[in-house]
């Protein structure tokens, strides 16, 4: 894909925001200097649970492009508090390792529970699962105070596809119990 972009004067924008939470994730950052048309987006929102701070960054080896991007940003676009939080978060590699281990354990448990309920669950190495179930599953769960991501607007998927987050065990148990209730009421 990078070669194609280079041959056609296009840029490849790669979102690595979930990469730190995935098993065996391999960043493309080592390719930046060989492929100047590559831009990599990283964010603290997913890996560090810092959604309210809205902090992220872009990696790119094209100095001219970075200069143009800098011209279009506001002078004070990132607060000093957000910068300090980002620097502190990057030092917490042990936190990421613990989080990945938790996700790995909970993902396996959740996949087994959902498969036992009859859901088609796609293999995953990330902190979320893609599954197929009843088209009204989101409504049944919403009545129980649980929101899941409908994926019927994703290319190639219909209204029975959903994405759920892998969370702490107690939260995953609540989700599974609600899904059991939703399926039992059919």
Region spans (language model):
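Conserved PLP-binding catalytic core of the aspartate aminotransferase-like
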Residues: 104, 108, 112-145
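Short beta-strand-to-loop capping motifs
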Residues: 60, 131-133, 166-168
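PLP-dependent aminotransferase class I/II
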Residues: 37-115, 119-120
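Short acidic/glycine-enriched loop/turn segments that link adjacent beta-strands
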Residues: 52, 125, 156-158
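PLP-dependent enzyme catalytic core of the Aspartate aminotransferase-like
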Residues: 143-144, 153-186
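Active-site pre-lysine segment of PLP-dependent enzymes
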Residues: 1-12, 16-47
């Amino acid at each position: 894909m990078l070669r194609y972009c280079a041959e056609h004067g296009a840029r490849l924008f790669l979102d690595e925001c979930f990469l730190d939470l995935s098993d065996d994730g391999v960043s493309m950052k080592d390719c930046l200097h060989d492929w100047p048309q590559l831009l990599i987006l990283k964010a603290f929102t997913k890996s560090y649970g810092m959604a309210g701070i809205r902090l992220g960054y872009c990696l790119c080896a094209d100095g001219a492009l970075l200069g143009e991007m800098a011209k279009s940003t506001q002078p004070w676009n990132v607060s000093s508090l957000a910068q300090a939080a980002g620097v502190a978060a990057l030092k917490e590699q042990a936190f990421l390792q613990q989080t990945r281990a938790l996700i790995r354990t909970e993902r396996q448990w959740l996949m087994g529970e959902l498969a036992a309920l009859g859901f088609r669950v796609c293999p995953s190495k990330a902190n979320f699962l893609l599954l197929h179930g009843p088209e009204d599953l989101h409504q049944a769960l919403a009545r129980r105070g649980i929101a899941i991501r409908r994926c019927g607007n994703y290319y190639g998927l219909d209204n029975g596809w959903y994405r759920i987050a892998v969370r702490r065990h107690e939260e995953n148990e609540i989700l599974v119990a609600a899904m059991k209730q939703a399926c039992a009421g059919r």
